[in-house]
Amino acid sequence: SGGGEGSGMWFGPRL
């Protein structure tokens, strides 16, 4: 997961 799961500054949208 990415931004929609972690904090919002990991991979992007929801990767």
Curated annotation (Swiss-Prot):
Entry-annotated residues carrying Leucine amide: L15
Keywords recorded for this protein, A-Z: Amidation, Neuropeptide, Secreted
Xref: PROSITE patterns: PYROKININ
GO cellular component entries: extracellular region
Domain of life the protein comes from: Eukaryota
Family in the record: Belongs to the pyrokinin family.
Name the UniProt record assigns to this protein: CAPA-Pyrokinin
Organism whose genome encodes this protein: Striatophasma naukluftense (Gladiator)
